[in-house]
């Protein structure tokens, strides 16, 4: 909040603009009194050039979604003129360039509804929130439902802000490419409460879904209700939560999507990744794949990743698990890194495979 207010003070009564010239994309900011402006993208910093009262930067990317950090005189700020998202437990501005993908465009068609639900969890001992997407023009009763999880450092809003999952489904429904289904998006960064203290514990999501959220939300909206009308998918950390949940409870799900995804849980018990002091997880959920009936559990088992994803070696190493256990999967490698430029098409493709 402080950074956002700081940005408003610096840029009050000003605007930031994206424009094209000679086939190149530029970001233009009005910040007359600043001495220096720069933009961080990953590990690199790009300085703006001052042109009169304006600061101009040729954007070093052409992909659709890009998290950036704007710095004014060395101070990182959030620009209210640009979209704000979050990842890796950090707030970012992001710049979205047109990529010709009509599935992510808001069009004059019927749109679904997003509902924010709150409840007190007996498992985390904390207030939890999840978001329900209800497709347009159809009653929720009897619909299939996909439980869709975000990645580390994100939240239940990520799939409908930066991810545009609801817009993608609206467009696919309008085009007649999918049958309508609902989404439930939970906060996978589960914060277990102990008195006044909280502790991140991603493992708890599985119990919360199975014991609390699924019974509660499916009773209220009358969707799902059986294995054939229920699926689960997630990206990055959410893929870990997905794999563990569907392997431990194959009787509950018929569709599985593992985006930039992992079969093994490399977070639990890892001293560099897990804030809970516990022994390394023994991957007991993977024993479900030893069951000869495993392939009959799921209509769709999609595993995918970007070709420049830093986790690609881990993904490729897990190919051996698939081969060894004889799992029938759909495997796709997309162009891109560990970001929304991969996860959006992952989701769009997966949506067209499931509940058919």
Enumerate the predicted regions with their spans:
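Short, Lys/Arg-enriched N-terminal segments with co-localized hydrophobic residues
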Residues: 1-11
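Non-catalytic cap/lid and distal C-terminal segments of serine-dependent acyl enzymes
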Residues: 13-45, 49-356
């Amino acid at each position: 909040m402080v950074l956002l207010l700081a940005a408003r003070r610096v840029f009050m009564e000003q605007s930031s603009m994206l424009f094209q010239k000679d086939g190149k994309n530029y970001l233009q900011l009005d910040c007359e009194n600043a001495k220096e402006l720069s933009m961080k993208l990953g590990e690199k910093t790009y300085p703006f050039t001052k042109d009169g009262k304006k600061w101009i930067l040729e954007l070093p990317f052409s992909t659709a979604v890009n998290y950036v950090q704007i710095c004014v005189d060395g101070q990182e700020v959030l620009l209210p003129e640009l979209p704000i998202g979050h990842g890796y437990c950090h707030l970012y501005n992001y710049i979205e360039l047109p990529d010709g993908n009509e599935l992510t465009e808001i069009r004059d068609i019927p749109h679904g509804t997003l509902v924010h639900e709150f409840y007190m969890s007996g498992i985390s001992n904390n207030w939890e929130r999840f978001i329900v997407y209800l497709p347009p023009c159809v009653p929720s009763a009897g619909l299939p439902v996909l439980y869709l999880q975000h990645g580390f450092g994100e939240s239940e809003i990520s799939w409908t802000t930066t991810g545009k999952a609801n817009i993608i489904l609206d467009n696919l429904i309008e085009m007649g490419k999918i049958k309508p289904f609902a989404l439930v998006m939970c906060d996978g960064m589960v914060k277990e409460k102990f008195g006044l203290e909280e502790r991140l514990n991603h493992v708890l999501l599985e119990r919360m879904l199975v014991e609390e959220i699924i019974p509660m939300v499916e009773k209220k909206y009358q969707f799902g209700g059986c294995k054939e009308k229920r699926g689960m998918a997630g990206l990055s950390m959410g893929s870990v939560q997905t794999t563990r949940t569907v392997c431990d409870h194959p009787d509950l799900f018929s569709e599985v999507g593992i985006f930039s995804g992992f079969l093994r849980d490399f977070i639990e018990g890892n001293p560099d990744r897990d804030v809970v002091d516990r022994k390394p997880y023994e991957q007991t959920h993977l024993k479900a794949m030893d069951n000869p009936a495993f392939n009959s559990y799921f209509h769709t088992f999609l595993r995918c990743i970007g070709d420049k994803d830093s986790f690609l070696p881990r993904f490729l190493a897990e190919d051996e698990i698939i081969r060894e256990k004889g799992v029938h999967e759909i495997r796709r490698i997309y162009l891109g890194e560990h970001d929304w430029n991969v996860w959006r098409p992952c989701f769009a493709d997966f949506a067209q495979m499931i509940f058919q």
